[in-house]
């Protein structure tokens, strides 16, 4: 499966790129959000705030998006829940899938 990258957003703090958010589409369906943040900035609220703004920017381009997260990545799960994602009953062992209707 080849992913198409869309809506790439760099997270910049004090002139330094510390993370990103993007949408990946597989075969033009099932858009999936992916994000990453430098560990030094974890638990600061930056990703939660950036994701709020990002979702507002893309809301007219998608009906819904998904996120796949390791089930032990509690910080990422909290970010998704704070941004209105709900867990759906699909996924492979060790991972959870979250969905957000836009």
Describe every region a protein language model picked out.
Residues 1:
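Conserved GNAT-fold acetyl-CoA-binding loop/helix
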Residues 4-102:
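Acyl-donor (CoA/ACP) binding surface of acyl/acetyltransferases
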């Amino acid at each position: 499966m080849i992913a198409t990258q869309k809506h790439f957003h760099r997270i910049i703090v004090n002139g330094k790129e510390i993370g990103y958010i993007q949408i990946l589409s597989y075969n033009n369906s099932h858009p999936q959000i992916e994000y990453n943040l430098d560990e030094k900035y974890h638990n600061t609220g930056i990703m939660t705030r950036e994701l709020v703004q990002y979702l507002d920017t893309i809301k007219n381009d998608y009906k819904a998006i998904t996120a796949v997260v390791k089930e032990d990545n509690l910080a990422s799960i909290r970010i998704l829940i704070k941004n209105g994602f709900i867990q759906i009953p699909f996924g492979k062992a060790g991972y959870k899938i979250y969905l957000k209707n836009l």
